[in-house]
Regions:
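Short, glycine/charged-enriched secondary-structure capping and boundary segments
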Residues: 1, 19-20, 152-154
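A short helix-turn-beta junction within AAA+ P-loop NTPase domains corresponding to the substrate/partner-engaging
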Residues: 1-11
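Phosphate-backbone binding and catalysis cores of DNA-processing enzymes
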Residues: 2, 37-39
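A generic structural signal for short hydrophobic patches within well-formed alpha-helices
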Residues: 10-13, 144-145
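Helix-loop-helix "sensor" segment of P-loop NTPases
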Residues: 14-25
Length: 180
């Protein structure tokens, strides 16, 4: 029996904050995400996310597996954060960060096991085509993605609003499916 604990879902917030509270905090959640500490201490959200990203991503993650090139892992995370919601191949990522496909696959597998990112395969009625299609990568939490990019600008000043919404909706759907 395995249970996955995700960042707080909109459904959970609805129970504690009500519909009005959920609507009022929506932009904040698109930018800062839904980790419990971030929700409970909104004034310190940036600092909490930077600390979480640095300790969780770099200390805990590097201790978990023998990551020989931590700088490369950082570059890969940045590349994934910049290309969130876009179809991307391992080959393209390898070229972007300057390594081989095998290393990219290993690091992405590690990031998935640590519940930082998840991937969705493209859909096709032809199974062979579906297997060949590039994947889309998403972050479990928008706040972690934005901490990696060091971008907490308001939605009105951002170029990636569509990507933030898509990542938010997909991660919310994932939570709803897991908790159902």
């Amino acid at each position: 029996f395995e249970y996955h604990l995700f960042p707080v879902s909109t459904g959970e917030l609805l129970k504690s904050q009500g519909l009005l509270g959920v609507k009022q905090t929506l932009e904040n959640r698109l930018i800062y995400g839904s980790y419990p500490d971030v929700i409970n201490h909104a004034a310190d959200a940036k600092e909490l996310l930077y600390n979480l990203a640095n300790s969780y991503l770099y200390k805990d993650l590097l201790n978990l597996e023998s990551v020989r090139r931590p700088a490369l892992l950082g570059k890969l995370l940045t590349a994934l954060a910049l290309q969130v919601t876009s179809e991307v191949s391992y080959n393209e990522l390898a070229q972007t960060v300057g390594t081989d496909n095998k290393t990219v696959e290993k690091y992405i597998d590690l990031l998935e096991k640590c519940y930082i990112i998840f991937k969705l395969s493209g859909f096709s009625r032809n199974l062979r085509t579906e297997l060949k299609k590039a994947k889309k990568f998403y972050f479990y939490d928008n706040g972690i993605r934005n901490a990696i990019l060091q971008n907490f600008a308001p939605l009105s000043l951002r170029q990636d609003v569509g990507a933030l919404w898509e990542n938010f909706f997909i991660s919310e759907r994932l939570k709803a499916n897991q908790y159902a």
